[in-house]
Amino acid sequence: MDMNRLTQKSQEALQEAQTAAGRMGHTEVDGEHLLLALLDQEDGLIPRLLQQAGTEPKELRAAVREELSHRPKATGPGAAPGQVFVTQRLARLLDAAEREAKRLKDEYVSVEHLLLALAEESSSTAAGLLLKQAGITRDSFLSALTQVRGNQRVTSANPEVAYEALEKYGRDLVLEARSGRLDPVIGRDAEIRRVTQILSRKTKNNPVLIGDPGVGKTAIVEGLAQRIVRGDVPEGLRDKTVFALDMGSLVAGAKYRGEFEERLKAVLSEVKAAEGRILLFVDELHTVVGAGAAEGAMDAGNMLKPMLARGELHMIGATTLDEYRKHIEKDAALERRFQQVLVDEPSVEDTISILRGLRERLEVFHGVKIQDTALVSAATLSHRYITDRFLPDKAIDLVDEACARLRTEIDSMPAELDEITRRVTRLEIEEAALSKESDPASKTRLEELRRELADLRGEADAKHAQWEAERQAIRRVQELRQELEQVRHEAEEAERAYDLNRAAELRYGRLQDLERRLAAEEEQLAAKQGENRLLREVVTEEEIAEIVAAWTGIPVARLQEGEREKLLRLDEILRERVIGQDEAVKLVTDAIIRARSGIRDPRRPIGSFIFLGPTGVGKTELAKTLARTLFDSEENMVRLDMSEYQERHTVSRLMGAPPGYVGYEEGGQLTEAVRRKPYSVVLFDEIEKAHTDVFNTLLQILDDGRITDAQGRTVDFRNTVIIMTSNIGSEHLLDGATAEGEIKPDARALVMGELRGHFRPEFLNRVDDIVLFKPLGERQIERIVELQFDELRQRLAERRITVELTDAGREVIAHQGYDPVYGARPLRRYISHEVETLVGRALLRGDVQDGATVRVDAEHGELVVTYDQPEDVKGAWAA
């Protein structure tokens, strides 16, 4: 027999038969070895055919192994390992298989021909007897083969690819809907109706669903499958089935030229043979264009066109707007064969309805209860804060993750119990150490420790018992919910089959009984938990808000008591750091309070301010302090020095370079920073130095609270505080300040006039407040000196060195280090030169030891720094 006429799987089976014979110590490879190899083949056709014929392959495999185990084995010095001979019977079997292939008009000898040859053998052979005992005859096997193979012939070395191609490379959505595996589809009636209209057409009956990712395109097709199951479709669609084709598995593993085309042709042949009963659904339709195309090969899109044009193939596609434009619209011949169905993002109200429909499924899966307020919160918060994704997908994800978080907490040890367990472990280690000591103090401590341990162990046991009881109760509730859903599904099936007795028994018998038991279990669980519950099994709006905060970094949870107090005291906290600028502090604080209390305009930033004033009066310091107070870190401040944006070509760096330019992939310095930290202070330092085109960019941010970057992504600025600092008119503020530090009305008018001369009206009109910073007086400078020394104290605290500043020293530093033109900035330089340098030298020389006290004083108008060592060793030097 010509071995080249064997298919790939047949050759593998013969090779495996030879290997099995050698492994078992047999010198000859026979028909039983071949039968075992056919049964053992991974993803093989024979086990599937035997199951179709009503035989269990595992039992037959065990019987063949049992038979082979009784055969004589070649052992000892005369045995030649690895040397296996083919029996005459096996050679005759191969010839018989070749005859079977000719009889079936096949070009290659496949595995089914080999099994037919084995089934044709008489009962005198072990293989023939075992197959007959298993109920496999030539006729029964041919019947099963016809069901799987249809009218296809073996024309290639890998024919299994073409058998049951739809089952292999697709999912039957109607079957899944009938078995209750699909989630319910709420709404989308207009889109499903439009799809059914297009499918009912004579030609060009191929709808393509186009919409943003996550709006529910696939759900529409699942909804159609569910309607087909319910019979809620036109007469022409009643007996149809929907197969979702998986392009990934169709392409995966296609190693050789033509293998992909062969698989797709097999799928299309099955669809054609079904004579319109199969609707083919291709998710991500754009993957069809170019799929499988290599040099000289035809891509999937071109293979589909003839069948689509003739109406032999009913296809439903789904893709996004961008992918449709990029791939499908370029191929006009393919595009005209599809009818577009645009799928818009649902409204918040529709999303809430969708979530209510999915609630029961999520509750059953996670074993938790979801409050209706949590669903409303998920829809509204995701719409408001997660702007780069689409409803209902992002809202469903929120609820799903909130449920998963609670489920994880239920399965993990509660924090209270975990803390007690850790304390018990720590005390047990201490007990083991103290038990080795013999002194009276250790013995006394040991007795106390053992009493404490006994109390803690008792508490831990009680908590553990409570935890287990609550977990068991939650598990019972979950099992009842699952059973309830199963009974509902069975009742629906019975109603579809018009088995009204069964439906009535389920609906008015078991279903009501289960609902009563579930209500009783939930009451029992609530009573068990009481006030001192360890586990939470109800998803509330608080959990949803926590997930949103974790995703976006925006604190959307309801204000906690501590945060409420902090916000009410925000102006006091800011005044501790920003000295002498009460008006600026009040305006900024009011904006934050309006935002966090939820009464501001949700379409604009939290607040936008222009800070005007001379250098060194606290404009940048206020922005830093605000970031530190609100977000616990100055890292949440996006600072842009506008002197870097003086030229026109540098403006593109804010939003990213346009396509085709270097740096396009990196995004903009402003937009990327805000995308990563959407809840932050954005500081545009020295705004007057920026190019005028920068203000065109800022107009949209200030008015709409959003901007589109170079890559087309919308960046949300609605949760940012925008601060722009400027030195415009600072000379008027310096000259026009009263002795008390107040700004004269005429000086204010001059500053505003100069401001209007520099910035356009449409820009100034969009800013919430223009804040004038007053020049600092000597009293404020003295308070700033104290703040600077607080920073020095913190730096020296690691070495336990304390710094004392006398009133005289403070006055000298304030007098020497202050310049009205430069503000408070020279203070830092003065302290650095006159104090920090001297202390640094003393530390290096060893004059100041750890634990010493450094005193900064003044004598005769000169600064004097002295130090006290812990051993009362003193030294002094004049500055």
Curated annotation (Swiss-Prot):
Q: Which UniProt keywords apply?
A: ATP-binding, Chaperone, Coiled coil, Cytoplasm, Nucleotide-binding, Repeat, Stress response
Question: What is the protein named?
Answer: Chaperone protein ClpB 2
Q: Would the keyword Chaperone turn up in this protein's UniProt record?
A: yes
Q: What is its main location?
A: cytoplasm
Q: Which organism is it from?
A: Streptomyces avermitilis (strain ATCC 31267 / DSM 46492 / JCM 5070 / NBRC 14893 / NCIMB 12804 / NRRL 8165 / MA-4680)
Any one of the GO CC terms: cytoplasm
Cell compartment(s), UniProt: Cytoplasm
Residues of the region (NBD1) are: 164-345
- Detail which positions bind ATP 2: 613-620
- Subunit arrangement? Homohexamer. The oligomerization is ATP-dependent.
